[in-house]
Amino acid sequence: MKVIIASQNPAKIAAVESAFNLAFPNDTFSFEGVSVKSGVPDQPMSCEETKQGAMNRINNAKIKLPNCDYYVGLEAGIEGNSTFAWMIIDNGLTVGESRSSSLPLPPQVIDEVKKGKELGDVMDEQFNTDNIKQKGGAIGLLTNNLLTRTSVYQQALILALIPFLHPTRF
């Protein structure tokens, strides 16, 4: 089965691959990341905007690569002083959704994000890292790598897969 991931971010792709392989150990998947627009600002600043970005990514991936088995949209955002992400999975018949855990951000980080910077760029500046958003993410930095962007996204993706694990109940 072909799974299209509406992102080329390695951390997001790894999370999707892991979640699908754990949820469906007897199935064989091929995964492809595709670069598509979210249709929202680079740094979404509300829950609604973030969720819309994930859905827009799926819709744009369907246009770019039609007739695949699953489409997965992931979008990270900020609301208040926390960051989180929406996961949406669509197979044309069923849609599964889940929001990740929320991660509190330091006030200095929030101040810079409110000036229009992306969270990943701010984290790189303040923690002297390079392209952290494609690695462990802010989550990895702030939890001393007890959690990573991939591990937190994997959990949320498994929750979004529940309707596909129990299709007769949804």
UniProtKB/Swiss-Prot annotation:
* Catalysed reactions, semicolon-separated: XTP + H2O = XDP + phosphate + H(+); ITP + H2O = IDP + phosphate + H(+)
Please state which protein family the record places this protein in.
Belongs to the YjjX NTPase family.
Q: How is the cofactor bound?
A: Binds 1 divalent metal cation per subunit; can use either Mg(2+) or Mn(2+).
The Swiss-Prot or TrEMBL record lists the needed cofactor(s) as: Mg(2+); Mn(2+)
Tell me the function of this protein. Answer: Phosphatase that hydrolyzes non-canonical purine nucleotides such as XTP and ITP to their respective diphosphate derivatives. Probably excludes non-canonical purines from DNA/RNA precursor pool, thus preventing their incorporation into DNA/RNA and avoiding chromosomal lesions.
Top class in the EC scheme: hydrolase
Q: What is this protein called?
A: Inosine/xanthosine triphosphatase
